[in-house]
Amino acid sequence: MVFISWKGDQAKSGGIASNIGVHFYDMLCWIFGDVKENVVHLKTADANAGSFRLKNANVRWFLSVNYNYIPNEVKAIGQRTYRSITVDGEEIEFSGGFTDLHTRSYKEILKGNGFGLDEAYGSINTVSTIRNLDAIGLKGEYHPFCKKILKS
């Protein structure tokens, strides 16, 4: 379980937003542009959620390591993870393809094909901001999965 290792320790990994979110935020900024506004709706040990106003998109995001928050239709097919983004009403599910991702990335870094500070700054700044913001609850443009945890 993630809470037993350093990954679930806020002081060691930065928590959910830093540990697993940084990659997602990096992808979002690469596709949709820089973060213009950053709001946090939910912060618990096993889930974080918020919303971004990016240069070219508005995004509601939800991250969790809790299997109970995965949609029932995803659990029904035996899937243990769920990664999805909906753009203009069309869902793109991208849960697969992450096997050995870190190992492959580290090999590329050792070959000199890593990323510099300029490429990493936006994502690191985003997670730092999230870590320092207070959660506002079910206000504004929150992700619908927040209702699995919070009550109006």
Report residues per predicted region.
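Predominantly a Rossmann-like dinucleotide-binding segment in NAD(P)-dependent oxidoreductases
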Residues: M1-K36
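Electropositive phosphate-/nucleotide-binding environments in soluble metabolic enzymes
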Residues: S18, V22, T99, G114
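A general structural signal for well-ordered alpha-helical segments in protein cores
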Residues: F24-Y25, H102, V127
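Conserved S-adenosyl-L-methionine
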Residues: V35-T44
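C-terminal substrate-binding/catalytic lobe of Rossmann-fold NAD(P)-dependent oxidoreductases
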Residues: A45-D100
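Conserved C-terminal active-site "lid" loop/helix of NAD(P)H-dependent oxidoreductases
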Residues: L101-K107
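C-terminal helix-rich "cap/oligomerization" subdomain common to oxidoreductases
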Residues: K107-S152
